[in-house]
């Protein structure tokens, strides 16, 4: 199950420059992080759901690519984002 419309709107308003900024790198990474954390809870209950695990790995890979792009463009925005999201890197 994907995120609700309200949850997505809150993430966009929190991480975007305005309420309609859904395409910025920060917003995309934040949305992927929310979906990944939602799926991690799913896998705690459904350990053998390999089909969805493939989707999870795809999301993690996409988030990694976006973070690498942001790190190359603006290191300050990158460090700010990973601190706000609580990511390891």
UniProtKB/Swiss-Prot annotation:
It comes from the Bacteria. It holds the Pfam family Ribosomal_S15. One of its GO terms (biological process) is translation. One of its GO terms (molecular function) is structural constituent of ribosome. Keywords: Ribonucleoprotein, Ribosomal protein, RNA-binding, rRNA-binding. One of the primary rRNA binding proteins, it binds directly to 16S rRNA where it helps nucleate assembly of the platform of the 30S subunit by binding and bridging several RNA helices of the 16S rRNA. Forms an intersubunit bridge (bridge B4) with the 23S rRNA of the 50S subunit in the ribosome. This is Small ribosomal subunit protein uS15. It comes from Sodalis glossinidius (strain morsitans). The gene is rpsO.
